């Protein structure tokens, strides 16, 4: 099919001819219009090839990569800086190479995305913030200063600088220092600036003439700035192998404990000590034991950054190169000036043309809670009360109910500041230049984690951070692969759906192997539709792009374009209880995960929604809740929650009065919040308008309360997943079999018109059989092979549709190509029957394996039939020649070619090349080019074993429960939904996350067969 011109594309999307381009806005074409672009979609929608720039970059090498990508159907090139990138980041020589990339891509009709920084997280400008704008660096609130005194003793000394709160508690045993203290010279002016070198954590102890010692925790890469007392006797540093004492964010509650209870309380209620008005701290400890006086301070502290432009070349991730103060719009403006405007001077004429936009990565607050100079002022404006008197209690442990509510107010305020002062200005800057801001947050797979870092502790609110982002995304570092349950891609897809964006990005893609295709399909069916093909690294031997990768590239491009046009069609909204997370409600997270998995496994499509959406910017009318994509929700499911916003409660009541369905599943909220969490609305909420299911499970009763499903299988299967989008006059469904068994079902689909199979592999469209029903549904026979995906469209049959799809299931085997083959893996040919490389003792082989077989056909070939070559099992990229005639490459089942025109009577020669990328061509995910997730790496929940026979709910599911329960108490073998604990020490555990580090299922490689020539 000829490439579409820009004019033709505008004809396909006439409503947007004068608006933003189709890749930036939700478009709803007709079936005929979608069919015109299916075989050759607009290239902006193409699979992204992630070019990892590590070491010395040359135009010659980069040009070879661009040429290779383009020759294999690649459309989009992403610049990604890696360790010791040269020329130096943002230097004239570096920007000249960037311009070269843009120019070469433009010549070929390709597009470019630019990584926003030189490493990650975004915000440190390759070290320029530390170098030129340290006053705009990231700041935090930490409980980092401690003074241990004996019971009954009195102390008096100058208050440590920048103190916000003070508390005292019974002292815990101090961790032993790893080495003797090193003396630090006492500064003549009293201003100590001491740098903690990379690789260690430290304590700096300042002792005065009275023997009173204050210990300050210092993280690797941080500079300690303090004013020491005039009577200072000594200063020394010690290295702490166990990390900084205390520090971190508030204890428990919203953030989860970060570094313990802020000050190492040994038990009992902490004593809150008022800040002295005169700056001189005076206190007498109660009798009995030692006391730890903890000073909660605001200071410059950065999340660790990996600066690929630094002197260590990104090898170390520490706090040396500070990120900006994300809560300060002035800092964001400087960041734009340092980085984005530097690019604009060189390639700005291609902004919104060849350059589609900017990518960000994992911007967050790691190990401390946010501070900015205007925090207290902004807090009082929004909440109506002063935060500072509560700060000490926020960090002390145990928490009082009042301090937990104050902490939730604090999270509410700073998460909004993060959105408004960093993310929104970056997106606005991009949109003003017809580009988009694209990226993912940190820990999206772990929403709340009392024992460590999480989305809520580090970034406040997933939904607020991504509220204005043009292309929200996820990071598939190692969380997704066969045998792993990881549903968290749904939250990024939901962020795009509810905010009116068509694309959802994924940082770590699959490769060009069958396992890579599983990773793509797994994400596509969960709504992620802008996928990476794993990186082009500096070393050619680690290049994840195969010479014959065009089949995978075209499959990804066609499928993700089809999944980006039209309007999302889920009718169910699953409430995401971020407000309850701020109050430390971990059960809310557990139940949210459980319901998400059960809905997916039982073909009930949904989007996550949050309080801001339901309570504010969704339109509410007689049809239901309408999001910014124009999608309408007919039901809202609310999992276990502690709190509900008054605005949400009021609108849910109106929604129910209009005929909408509201279902509370699990523990119902007992607190209603209007302006502040500190002072909630009196009384419990009236939920009489809703259905309440206390079990915390998707039961038959819950299903009965939901709208009529758009997909219903005649026989249940928790291994068939789907997603649904609506066109102007038709419906688009993607189905994916996540098991290794062939599954056949009759499926009832909402829609009217001709049922069609849209083949993303070759871009063809075929009519399918279907029986229309009077209720506006169609009964469709659906067979899905092992890990197979299919795209079904219902609507008018396009003019460019082909004949009905041919199946070889009933074909006649004309020749069985059994016996010996000539097999060449490397230099020495073998004569052997077909077996895996592992069975041949070549399990580590990478590259191209050549197979040759001569076979005879009957003297009289069947008349009126087509001849098909079926390779059987391959599990890698396969390319064939029959009697010297080339055929296209195939990268996944089924490995079948129509070879009618190449076969002759008598002797024939078949040549097969099987190719696999070298392991290590990309990060994580398993499979060729990736390598499995390491034990202890972050990952998805490992499936607890083979699904039960027939893929139906197991017998031990409680009566009335639809599918297997999910949770720590679930029995082993309880189906795909069970087992939330870590499988191999991984840290993923949040919404769709779970135990991690499980390697992908082992798959034998090579041509295994059986190989058949079939007449059909």
Where are these regions (language model features)?
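Short, surface-exposed tryptophan/glycine-enriched loops
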Residues: 228-231, 856-857, 895-909, 913-918
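Mature N-terminal segment immediately following signal peptide/propeptide cleavage
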Residues: 30-76
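Aromatic-lined ligand-binding clefts that engage carbohydrates, nucleic acids, or primary amines
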Residues: 194, 746-747, 855-883, 891, ...
């Amino acid at each position: 099919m000829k490439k579409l011109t820009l004019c033709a594309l505008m004809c396909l999307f006439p409503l947007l001819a004068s608006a933003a381009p189709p890749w930036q806005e939700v478009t709803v074409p007709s079936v005929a219009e979608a069919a015109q672009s299916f075989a050759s979609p607009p290239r902006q929608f193409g699979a992204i090839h992630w070019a990892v720039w590590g070491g010395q970059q040359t135009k010659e090498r980069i040009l070879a990569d661009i040429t290779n990508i383009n020759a294999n159907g690649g459309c989009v090139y992403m610049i990604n800086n890696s360790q010791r990138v040269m020329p130096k980041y943002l230097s004239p020589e570096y920007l000249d190479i960037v311009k070269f990339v843009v120019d070469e891509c433009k010549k070929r009709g390709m597009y470019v995305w630019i990584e926003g920084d030189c490493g990650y997280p975004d915000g440190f400008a390759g070290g320029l913030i530390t170098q030129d704008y340290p006053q705009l660096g990231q700041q935090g609130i930490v409980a980092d200063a401690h003074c241990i005194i004996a019971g009954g003793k009195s102390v008096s000394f100058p208050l440590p600088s920048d103190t916000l709160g003070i508390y005292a508690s019974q002292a815990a045993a101090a961790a032993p220092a790893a080495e003797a203290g090193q003396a630090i010279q006492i500064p003549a002016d009293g201003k100590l600036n001491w740098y903690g070198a990379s690789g260690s954590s430290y304590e700096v102890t300042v002792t005065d003439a009275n023997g009173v010692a204050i210990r300050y925790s210092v993280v690797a890469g941080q500079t300690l700035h303090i004013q020491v007392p005039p009577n200072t006797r000594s200063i020394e540093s010690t290295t702490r192998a166990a990390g900084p004492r205390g520090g971190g964010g508030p204890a428990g509650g919203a953030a989860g404990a970060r570094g313990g209870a802020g000050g190492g309380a040994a038990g009992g209620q902490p004593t809150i000590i008022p800040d002295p008005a005169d700056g001189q701290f005076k206190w007498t400890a109660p009798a009995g034991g030692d006391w730890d006086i903890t000073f909660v301070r605001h200071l410059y502290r950065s999340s660790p950054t990996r600066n690929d432009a630094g002197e260590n070349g990104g090898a170390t991730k520490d706090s040396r190169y500070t990120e900006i103060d994300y809560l300060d719009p002035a800092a964001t403006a400087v960041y734009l000036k340092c980085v984005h405007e530097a690019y604009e001077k060189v390639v700005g004429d291609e902004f919104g043309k060849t350059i589609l936009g900017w990518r960000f990565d994992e911007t967050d607050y790691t190990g401390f809670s946010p501070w900015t100079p205007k925090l207290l002022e902004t807090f009082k404006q929004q909440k109506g009360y002063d935060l500072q008197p509560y700060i000490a209690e926020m960090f002390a442990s145990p928490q009082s109910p009042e301090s937990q509510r104050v902490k939730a107010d604090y999270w509410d305020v700073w998460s909004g500041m993060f959105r408004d002062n960093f993310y929104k200005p970056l997106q606005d800057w991009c949109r003003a230049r017809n580009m988009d801001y694209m990226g993912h947050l940190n820990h999206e797979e772990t929403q709340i984690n009392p024992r460590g870092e999480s989305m809520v502790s580090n970034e406040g609110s997933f939904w607020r951070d991504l509220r204005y982002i043009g292309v929200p995304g996820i990071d598939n570092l190692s969380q997704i692969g066969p045998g792993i349950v990881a549903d968290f891609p749904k939250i990024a897809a939901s962020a795009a759906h509810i905010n009116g964006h068509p694309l959802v990005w994924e940082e770590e893609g699959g490769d060009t192997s069958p396992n890579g295709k599983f990773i793509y399909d797994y994400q596509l069916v969960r709504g992620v539709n802008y996928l990476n093909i794993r990186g082009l690294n500096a070393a050619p031997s680690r290049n994840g792009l195969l010479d014959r990768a065009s089949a995978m590239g075209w499959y990804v491009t066609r499928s993700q374009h089809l999944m980006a046009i039209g309007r999302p069609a889920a009718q169910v909204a699953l409430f995401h209880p971020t407000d309850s997370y701020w109050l430390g409600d971990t059960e809310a997270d557990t139940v949210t995960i459980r319901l998400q998995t059960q809905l997916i496994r039982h073909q009930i499509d949904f989007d996550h929604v949050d309080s801001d959406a339901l309570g504010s910017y969704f339109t509410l009318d007689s049809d239901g809740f309408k999001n910014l994509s124009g999608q309408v929700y007919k039901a809202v499911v609310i999992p276990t929650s502690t709190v509900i916003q008054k605005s949400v409660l009021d609108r849910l009541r109106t929604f129910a009065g209009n005929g909408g369905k509201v279902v509370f599943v699990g523990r119902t909220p007992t607190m209603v919040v209007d302006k502040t969490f500190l002072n909630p609305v009196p009384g419990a909420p009236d939920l009489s308008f809703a259905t309440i299911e206390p079990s915390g499970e998707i039961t038959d009763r819950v299903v009965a309360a939901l709208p009529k499903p758009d997909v219903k299988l005649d026989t249940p299967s928790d291994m068939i997943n789907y997603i649904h989008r609506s066109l102007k006059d038709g419906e688009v469904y993607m189905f994916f079999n996540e098991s290794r068994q062939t599954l056949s079902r009759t499926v009832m689909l909402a829609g009217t018109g001709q049922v069609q199979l849209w083949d993303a592999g070759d871009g063809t469209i075929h009519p399918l059989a279907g029986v229309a029903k009077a209720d506006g549904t169609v009964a469709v026979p659906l067979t899905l092979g092992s890990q197979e995906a299919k795209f079904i469209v219902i609507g008018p049959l396009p003019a460019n549709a082909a004949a009905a799809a041919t199946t070889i299931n009933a074909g006649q085997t004309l020749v069985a190509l059994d016996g010996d083959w000539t097999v060449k893996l490397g230099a020495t040919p073998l004569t052997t029957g077909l077996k895996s490389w592992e069975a041949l003792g070549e399990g580590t082989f990478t590259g191209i394996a050549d197979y040759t077989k001569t076979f005879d056909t009957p003297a009289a070939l069947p008349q009126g039939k087509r001849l098909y070559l079926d390779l059987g099992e391959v599990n890698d990229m396969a390319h064939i020649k029959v009697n010297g005639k080339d055929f296209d490459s195939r990268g996944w089942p089924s490995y079948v070619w129509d070879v009618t025109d190449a076969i002759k009577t008598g002797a024939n020669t078949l040549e097969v090349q099987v190719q696999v990328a070298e392991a290590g061509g990309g990060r994580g995910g398993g499979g060729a080019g990736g390598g499995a997730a390491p034990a202890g790496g972050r990952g998805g929940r490992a499936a607890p074993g083979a699904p039960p026979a027939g893929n139906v709910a197991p017998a031990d599911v409680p009566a009335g429960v639809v599918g297997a329960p999910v949770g720590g108490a679930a029995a082993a073998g309880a189906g795909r939904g069970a087992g939330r604990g870590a499988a191999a020490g991984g840290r993923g555990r949040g919404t769709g996350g779970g135990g991690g580090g499980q390697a992908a299922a082992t798959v034998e490689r090579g041509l295994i067969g059986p190989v058949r020539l079939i007449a059909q």
